A protein has these predicted regions:
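UBC/E2-like fold recognition across ubiquitin and ubiquitin-like conjugation systems
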Residues: 1-171
Length: 171
């Protein structure tokens, strides 16, 4: 019965967040359901932040919510090409607020930096936009991208420019 109550809470909360975003869109991204029958899987398009290497890009991602949301974080995976130190090669986003609550077993993050149930779709996507503006190369998900970011910035810029161009071609 508890799983059913958690699913009901998650469903109600996600419907509310979707309604709020439809009523009051936020600059920098758009969001909706992948399939109208599944509130737990969202399609998000993030507009590359102005004055960054990602400026002009339109990057698609899938946000998948667990049945016990908001007690556990969603996963976010770019489906568009993305070259970034904090995005795994398979597109999964690696930022602190998407990590399960509690202490970090690796000691990189404070518990206060990790997931809390107060986060919303809006706060998650705004954190991803901030990540695009300011990569964290100290605990990278994509070691090669982080190394290029630090040591071969021109190569890094070329790969990001290619990803931006490809995202524009997909429109």
């Amino acid at each position: 019965m508890a799983a059913s109550a958690a699913t009901t809470q998650a469903t109600l909360l996600l419907h509310k967040q979707l309604r709020d975003l439809m009523k009051n869109p936020v600059d920098g991204f758009s969001a909706g359901l992948v399939d109208d029958c599944n509130i737990f899987e969202w399609s998000v398009t993030i507009i590359g932040p102005p004055d960054t290497l990602y400026d002009g890009g339109y990057f698609n991602a899938i946000m998948s919510f667990p049945q016990n949301y908001p007690n556990s974080p969603p996963t976010v995976r770019f489906t568009s090409e993305m070259w970034h130190p904090n995005v795994y090669p398979d597109g999964r986003v690696c930022i602190s607020i998407l990590h399960a609550p509690g202490d970090d077993p690796n000691g990189y993050e404070l518990a206060s930096e990790r997931w809390t149930p107060v986060h919303t779709v809006e706060s998650i996507v705004l954190s991803i936009i901030s990540m695009l503006s300011s990569p964290n190369d100290e605990s990278p998900a994509n070691v090669e991208a982080a190394k290029e970011w630090r040591e071969k910035r021109d190569e890094f810029k070329k790969k990001v420019s290619r990803a931006v161009r490809r995202s524009q071609e997909m429109l």
